[in-house]
Swiss-Prot record:
Species in which this protein is naturally found: Legionella pneumophila (strain Paris)
Oligomeric and partner information: The Tol-Pal system is composed of five core proteins: the inner membrane proteins TolA, TolQ and TolR, the periplasmic protein TolB and the outer membrane protein Pal. They form a network linking the inner and outer membranes and the peptidoglycan layer.
The protein's name in its UniProt record: Tol-Pal system protein TolB
Location(s), subcellular: Periplasm
Gene (UniProt): tolB
Family: Belongs to the TolB family.
Amino acid sequence: MCNRIISLFLLLFTGQVIALDLELTQGINSALPIAINSFGSDAAAQEIGNVIENDLTISGQFKIISGPQGANSQSSVSTLRQLGADSVVTGRVNQVGNRIEVSFTLADAVANGNILLTKTFQINANQVRALAHHISDEVYQKLTGERGIFSTRIAYISVQRNGGRSRYSLEVADADGHNPQSLLVSSEPIMSPSWSPNGKSISYVSFEKKKAEIFTVSVETGQRRLITSFPGINGAPAWSPDGRHLAVVLSKSGTPKIYDVDLSSGSMKQLTFGNSIDTEPRYSPDGRSLLFTSGRGGSPQVYRLSLADGQISRVTFEGNYNARASYTPDMKHIVMLHREDRQFNIGVQNTGGGPISNLTFSGLDESPSVSPNSRLVLYATRYQDRGVLGIVSIDGRIRMRLPAREGDVQEPAWSPYLS
């Protein structure tokens, strides 16, 4: 994988639906203890409870406390408090005609079971998982004061190999990896998925015509739009915060450079100049600057381009390879691919500068993408000789692995908030 990353930089970047299963590899001792009481015995009720438990585990902020009878049982708040729970979620699922009625209550086990939150919903059978994610968001926000990310989605590329043939698919799934859907399938590579700010479209690079082209695709309808198809490199699309522009990399004039494409008019403006390779642009959340990777200093490093005056400043100085950088949505950190001692890991640096800290340590990590609440980083890695996705907290204290059941998973992108 590392050799491929180097080759992709030098070149600019040069089936079956896969579901993902959560595996927690490292947690924290300060997680909030919470119990999820059974919502009932039928399939929908059990699924809701399981999804909520899984979501809160993914956040890394919660420790799940099991009742004395284990899963799929209900225990009193006082009993669960004795087992260590600070909060308790209790729910009920009923059939109302052809609809499903779901009620839930969040209680403060420390304060004698005081009710913190209670709500009732009516849904269709195909909305069970979506509602469970919504309940997780409500619980998370009530207990932490921050917006939950469980109703967001992730995009990634899955690759199925059979002999000498490969099948590439652009997938979209829930944030927990479930409910995957194929937006595109091709026998040629698909690369660099990037979400629009409203979460309705994804930009990507396609090689379906034996050359690189940049497209956008509607997540809802699958309708595609060709953005660029110049000779040479068309790569690394990234949306502006207002969704009106794409920053792209083109080699139509020779050396790969970064351009801005106005999506309404189709007009283009060149943003970087000179003889060095410039690639992997990412807008800052405030839209005032771009981070990008360039070899202008002799090795791949991260630079910042001011969109107001075109001034470029170097961001990274530690190590001889830093790339794929992006701001966290709160703009407190810059997350990047960092090479040290021939090991490729996910690194983080304060926006104001300073040392780069490794968040991962496998040496085979790439493609970091930050959650919309700035707390988690989704990335691609290798596990048991397969491409899988990992999640790490921005402080490095929580690590999870989402192993794919089949094939390889790569180039993940985390959506923005979708509502």
